[in-house]
Amino acid sequence: MHAYARNISTTAADTTVLEDVRANFGDFSDKTLSSYKSALERLFVIEDVPAWCPAIRSRTAIRSTRKKEFTDPSIAVAALGASPQRLLADLQTFGFIFETLCIRDLRAYTSAIGGKLSYYRDRYGLESDCVLHLPDGRFALIEFKLGNRQIEEGAAHLVQIRELIHEANASKPGVRIEEPSLMMVVTGGSLAYTRKDGVHVVPIGCLKQ
């Protein structure tokens, strides 16, 4: 649990988790790790997020590893033994915990309408922390940014992905990719607004079913 929590909201390979476990607890086989993961999934303790692989880059450029997530961020915090003071002193870890919180809320709020979550990341550093898919084919590109200073970066990523979709549709007219119905940066702030580029900035407290 501790090793998994150390890699929360990342695409770290299972071998990375295994090395972490072995460093702290000695001999531990990959078969044992796999059985532990299966048990935690059945108990709804962990629920990894699959990758979204649209035809906007070559398949080798788009990451396909599942992103590691707990069903609730409090489990990760408990596994890490992290206090509020420790999280405030380690904003990178706090950011990953915040991402898990957002994923949990979006899963809860959209499950009734058949919403499914994935993520996008390529080898060039372009990413969308979450892609929300609806049964009718519509989807939203979403970034999670704990601090207001990161909003610009998150919005830029979403706009770039939208532009890649435009370019892919223009170059392959016979294979059209739907464009995002919504681009949103979820923040830990208190102000909600829409930017000139069409990206909505939404505090996590404003999310609802």
Name each region found by the language model:
Residues 181-209:
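Domain-level recognition of nuclease-like catalytic cores that cleave nucleotide substrates
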Residues 18, 155-169:
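Short, well-ordered amphipathic alpha-helices
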Residues 163-182:
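Short mixed-charge
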Residues 138-140, 182:
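Structural motif
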Residues 140-149, 157:
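Active-site ExK catalytic segment of metal-dependent nucleases
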Residues 78, 151-153, 192-196:
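Switch/connector loops and helix/strand junctions flanking conserved nucleotide-binding motifs
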Residues 123, 153-154:
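Basic, glycine-rich polyanion-binding accessory segments appended to enzymes
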Residues 1-138:
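Accessory nucleic acid-recognition modules appended to NTPase machines
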